[in-house]
Amino acid sequence: MAISDVPAAAGTTATTTSDSDLRQPSLRRRSSAGVLFDAARDSGSDNSLTGKITDDDNIKDHKPNNHAASDDNVGAAANDAGQEHRQPVADFKYAYRPSVPAHRRIKESPLSSDNIFRQSHAGLFNLCIVVLVAVNSRLIIENLMKYGWLIKYGFWFSSKSLRDWPLFMCCLSLAIFPLAAFVVERLAQQKCISEPVVVLLHLIISTVELCYPVLVILRCDSAFVSGVTLMLLTCIVWLKLVSYAHTNYDMRALTVSNEKGETLPNTLIMEYPYTVTFRSLAYFMVAPTLCYQTSYPRTPSVRKGWVFRQLVKLIIFTGVMGFIIEQYMNPIVQNSTHPLKGNLLYAIERILKLSVPNVYVWLCMFYCFFHLWLNILAELVRFGDREFYKDWWNAKTVEEYWRMWNMPVHKWMVRHIYFPCLRRGIPKGAASLIAFLVSAVFHELCIAVPCHMFKLWAFIGIMFQVPLVLITNYLQNKYRNSMVGNMIFWFIFCILGQPMSVLLYYHDLMNRKGEVD
């Protein structure tokens, strides 16, 4: 066997023919190029090495004596079986030749600033999960050894909550208001009442639906959990009633425009004449959406096994959330002072200490409600649109966060507040301010009413988002593709804003209870 005088590259072997008169060397490529590909991968994952081998093959195969080349091919085919077992040895011998360049192009380190966001960090993510589990497991064991079992079941399963029959009856009576709205819409469809009367009746129905539970909670010394549950349900029903009335009003207006022969955009999907049915209203009231429409995308069937697994997850994560609240957050809050009245450094220390368990509770709450519960409800009623949230954790601005973290409310705001304001000629900034104002009012109602006090901390916290939106938008426009806004969002929401709100409401609530006692 002779070696070609042309420098051979990785993955090639030299063979001789069986003809004694023609001893011309022939360079033949191996059929399996595993080692060659390994060499190419180690040298930079480019094709230059393969190209070099191909060029060398062409040089050696380009002979003036065609008969010799033909004999070489015949000899190579005949010796395939004999050469097969010698291929690994030859590949190993010629795979990493010193003459082959190891550095072929300009490349960045994987963790350099220009290349770090192009890499996959799945391994580091797994490492963070392992470290997080290990560290928190140690902290839980240390906490239990030091303080013991601090969970008080009375906060979650108190007999007082079971005896809140006025709140329970008020919760059941909320079904009256959708029925009243349906009667109004039927009368409007039959043209028994004029449009101004329809608007007035819907205004009365929605106002009474919102004020009636507030009065019941304030009149009754109910448990906090019962009051929060009733207020959340009240706000959901109110938002649904507004959407139901507004959508039917818009459909009547479109029907009139269609009867006049006006051209409507293709994006409008509705049947003429539209009909008001109790079935569509009943489905809307139980569906995991706040925006009414006559039909929704539906899934073909209910996955019972999947629902059971999600219910198990819901129970587990709800228990984890309750454990963190009782075992960590309550002792921290009870051993703190009012953040606006005590020592500043001590208040900062309490806020920072409260921030970590608060982040866990907030993430568990989001996962339990927006992912588990809403998906369970959607599966049971075969609701097809499961986009209840987007990747809000990657939000670069506060505005992006509010657009992505709660999609049912965001769609309601856009459909019934923001764009109606724009169609009325209101500027975009003012329309956004109105949307935040509505959100702030309902956040305050859901917290202040069950606490039986109106300190406006939740209202101020939501309205404070407006300057944060301007600041983070400015930073995003100035520093393109930066995560400065994302860091500000995480700091304001989880490190400063929510722990501060918890301390403020707790101490104000304790002061109120002390005054009452």
UniProtKB/Swiss-Prot annotation:
Residues forming the catalytic site: H443
Keyword entries, A-Z: Acyltransferase, Endoplasmic reticulum, Membrane, Transferase, Transmembrane, Transmembrane helix
Subcellular location: Endoplasmic reticulum membrane
GO molecular function, one term: diacylglycerol O-acyltransferase activity
EC numbers for this chain: 2.3.1.20
Associated pathway: Glycerolipid metabolism; triacylglycerol biosynthesis
GO cellular component: chloroplast envelope; endoplasmic reticulum membrane
Pfam families membership: MBOAT (PF03062)
Cystine bridges: none
TM regions (residue ranges): 121-141, 165-185, 197-217, 222-242, 272-292, 305-325, 361-381, 429-449, 451-471, 484-504
Keyword DNA-binding applies: no
Organism superkingdom: Eukaryota
Membrane topology value: Multi-pass membrane protein
Biased composition (Basic and acidic residues): 53-64
Region (Disordered): 1-82
UniProt enzyme class: transferase
Motif (FYXDWWN motif): 388-394
Keyword match Transferase: yes
Reactions catalysed: an acyl-CoA + a 1,2-diacyl-sn-glycerol = a triacyl-sn-glycerol + CoA
Family: Belongs to the membrane-bound acyltransferase family. Sterol o-acyltransferase subfamily.
Function: Involved in triacylglycerol (TAG) synthesis. Catalyzes the acylation of the sn-3 hydroxy group of sn-1,2-diacylglycerol using acyl-CoA.
Name listed for the protein in its UniProt record: Diacylglycerol O-acyltransferase 1C
